[in-house]
């Protein structure tokens, strides 16, 4: 490229990274809002940890399968269309979830008119579960197309560093929605029903014998705030879907610039091209041992990550004695400081010292995560927040290294022709992890206490490190083959 083309390319590359970062952060707005709303759902409706964990598990499994399906779709079509439509539909699902209690009540009334008696609480759990599973599928329309777009805009030799910066969108999205819901919505919005004896009695019963007067008062003074945790982020997501569609370009060629790697496109026209492409995908993805090893490692990484992210507000309040606002603060620091610094640092280290061999960096990260989990577990309940915040932040620093780098490694191994498909496989493994981090984690916490839950996280971190060690000698990418 000449100087003019280079300047134009650099400008478009930066714009594309920023636009897609904002877009994917907004996917998190309509996904991780659920974590902050969980205590409110328990307080108002008595939904158990097992049920909440089941929501997370089903959502995660469907999301993983959706990432695989939509990875294939994105590799063969317009990535930005897949992403923009997906974000719009996620917003719609969140709006419906925000009024799901009204939907459940309507179903109960309608059934009664037809001579059938249904229990409101049961119908509500089913309604919420179905809506959140649908949202799980729609969420899978986010990362595969964005991964494809990035592999077209970033050279493989720079992918670890620049994609680590891009992956800050995970932490930015989760951190912002945690702040919006945990600092603004839950503590300040909703209806003040503290003078309503029936509401106070219901909340007291739902929270159980260990509930403090302060907790009961807080939830009764902000009754219904949980629904705004879904409605307000959905409004941002609707605007974001329009932005993705109008601003993002799938590849440099769409704006008259040369591709960063001159390889055949995934887009196929003739039967011969289709056969050649399918053979390529079988060899680089489905028949590639490294992709499956990275997928298994992703399973363990996501258990650790989701245990801290999805259960963080509940786990920190119940096992460490923190208020919901302070637990939210720790989760935000886990994301914003630990996660963002970790992703950028480990991405830079990968390109600088490990010759873009991201899998080697991930071994160090998982060993660090295991040590940090053990340290945090050992801190007694009631310990000052400023002591607890350091190991919890370090956990984010370590776990977000492989969270970002495993997908980069898979994209490099599969090349940009099949990057989204490879990341779809990683998505299946990653979100199959919710079998443990979702309903499994909820069951262990409810029946065996938080010590059992912490032990589960520690074992997963150790297994992740061992899995990654098996591919220590692998090449950095599959372009040379």
What are these regions (language model features)?
Residues 356-406:
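C-terminal transmembrane helical hairpin of 12-TM major facilitator-type secondary transporters
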Residues 34-38, 181, 288-344, 403, ...:
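Extracytoplasmic gate region of multi-pass secondary transporters
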Residues 76-87, 351-366:
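Cytoplasmic membrane-interface "Motif A"-like loop-to-helix N-cap segments
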Residues 166-252:
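Helix-loop-helix hairpin linking two adjacent transmembrane segments in secondary transporters
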Residues 131-169:
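Cytoplasmic helix-loop-helix junction between adjacent transmembrane helices
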Residues 88-121, 367-381:
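C-terminal ends and interior cores of transmembrane alpha-helices
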């Amino acid at each position: 490229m000449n100087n003019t083309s280079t300047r134009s390319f650099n400008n478009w590359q930066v714009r594309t990274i920023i636009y897609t970062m904002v877009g994917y952060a907004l996917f998190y707005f309509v996904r991780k809002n659920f974590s902050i709303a969980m205590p409110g759902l328990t307080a108002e409706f008595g939904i158990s940890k097992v049920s909440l964990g089941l929501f997370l598990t089903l959502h995660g499994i469907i999301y993983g399968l959706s990432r695989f399906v939509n990875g294939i779709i994105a590799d063969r079509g317009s990535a930005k269309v897949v992403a923009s439509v997906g974000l719009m539909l996620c917003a719609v699902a969140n709006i419906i979830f925000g009024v799901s209690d009204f939907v459940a009540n309507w179903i109960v009334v309608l059934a009664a008119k037809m001579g059938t008696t249904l229990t409101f609480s049961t119908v509500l759990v089913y309604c919420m579960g179905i809506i959140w599973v649908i949202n799980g599928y729609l969420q899978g329309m986010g990362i595969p197309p964005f991964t494809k777009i990035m592999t077209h805009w970033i050279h493989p030799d720079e992918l670890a560093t620049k994609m680590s910066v891009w992956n800050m969108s995970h932490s930015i999205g989760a951190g912002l929605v945690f702040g919006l819901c945990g600092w603004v919505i839950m503590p300040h919005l909703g209806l003040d029903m503290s003078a309503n004896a029936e509401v106070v009695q219901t909340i007291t019963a739902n929270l159980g014998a260990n509930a403090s007067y302060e907790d009961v008062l807080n939830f009764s003074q902000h009754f219904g705030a949980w629904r705004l945790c879904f409605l307000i982020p959905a409004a941002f997501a609707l605007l974001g879907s329009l932005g993705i569609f109008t601003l993002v370009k799938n590849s440099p060629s769409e704006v008259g610039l040369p591709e960063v790697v001159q390889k055949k496109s995934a887009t196929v026209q003739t039967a011969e091209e289709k056969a050649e492409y399918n053979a390529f995908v079988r060899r680089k993805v489905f028949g590639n041992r490294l992709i499956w090893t990275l997928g298994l490692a992703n399973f363990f990484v996501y258990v650790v990550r989701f245990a801290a992210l999805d259960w963080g507000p509940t786990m920190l309040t119940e096992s460490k004695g923190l208020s919901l606002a302070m637990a939210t603060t720790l989760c935000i620091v886990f994301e914003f400081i630990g996660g963002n610094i970790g992703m950028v640092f480990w991405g830079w280290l990968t390109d600088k010292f490990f010759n873009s061999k991201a899998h080697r960096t991930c071994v160090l990260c998982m060993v660090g995560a295991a040590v940090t989990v053990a340290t945090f577990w050992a801190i007694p309940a009631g310990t000052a927040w400023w002591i607890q915040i350091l190991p919890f932040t370090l956990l984010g620093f370590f776990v977000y290294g492989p969270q970002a780098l495993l997908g980069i490694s898979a994209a490099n191994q599969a090349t940009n022709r099949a990057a989204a498909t490879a990341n779809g496989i990683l998505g299946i493994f990653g979100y199959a992890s919710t079998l443990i981090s979702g309903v499994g984690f909820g069951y262990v916490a409810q029946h065996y206490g938080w010590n059992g839950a912490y032990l589960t996280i520690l074992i997963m971190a150790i297994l992740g490190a061992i899995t990654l060690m098996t591919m220590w000698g692998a090449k950095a990418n599959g372009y040379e083959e």
